Design a protein with these regions (language model features):
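Multi-pass alpha-helical transporter architecture, strongest
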Residues: 151-178
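A membrane-interface helix-boundary motif in multi-pass transporters
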Residues: 137-155
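Loop-to-transmembrane helix entry/capping segments in MFS-fold secondary transporters
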Residues: 25-26, 110-120
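Intracellular juxtamembrane helix-capping segments at the cytosolic ends
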Residues: 95-108
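Helix-to-loop junctions at the C-terminal end of transmembrane segments
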Residues: 42-54, 139-140
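Structural signature of the two symmetry-related core transmembrane helices
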Residues: 57-72
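Helix-loop junctions at membrane interfaces in 12-TM secondary transporters
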Residues: 74-85
Length: 178
């Protein structure tokens, strides 16, 4: 989860500066409203897919949405684009965050769930911190739009970690439980 939170830390910490650079400060409060709306839509629409066992489709679909959203910051020029980016950013995280939380709780024995959740939340916080720090370093040299686009690499790394380790581990534990 740490890799997936790096762009989140960058967006939350620096979207107001980017909006100011682009002359879109009047739209910025609505960016956060659209971000939350995307999260709400994801919560309402994905539970049936999770219950049907198609978690891989959700993971890769939301990662694709998030990669496209972050790369789209390179072309940010209108308030509508900023609002759409907020919505799709929220949609992607609204799917991933609870899905990975369920992986943690669903594969950990009950006595160890507190430790597992604490580790999960620590990776969450570390990723946000790295994202904020990284964007602070990048903004002066390459600019915020390119910096936001480059954070999409963290999603690709997170997707590779999921593909090579997390999904296999999750399926192994689920099969052992049945």
């Amino acid at each position: 989860m740490m890799f997936l939170m790096i762009p989140y830390g960058a967006v939350i910490a620096y979207s107001s500066i980017l909006a100011q650079e682009k002359g879109l400060t009047g739209v910025l409060p609505y960016f956060y409203i659209f971000l939350v709306a995307g999260m709400l839509v994801s919560k309402l629409s994905t539970q049936k897919i999770i219950d049907s066992g198609r978690h891989k489709a959700l993971v890769y679909g939301s990662l694709a949405v998030l990669v496209v959203t972050m790369v789209s910051y390179l072309f940010l020029s209108t308030g509508i684009h900023l609002l759409a980016a907020g919505f799709f950013f929220g949609l992607g995280y609204g799917i991933l965050q609870p899905l990975f939380q369920s992986f943690v709780t669903g594969t950990t024995p009950a006595p160890q769930r507190g430790v597992a959740n604490a580790t999960y939340m620590l990776s969450y916080d570390v990723g946000i911190g790295i994202g904020s720090l990284l964007m602070g370093c990048l903004q002066e040299t390459i600019g915020l739009p390119m910096g936001f686009a480059l954070t999409a690499i963290a999603y690709l790394v997170g997707g590779l970690v999921f593909l090579s380790y997390v999904d296999r581990y999750y399926r192994k534990l689920k099969n052992a439980a049945q």
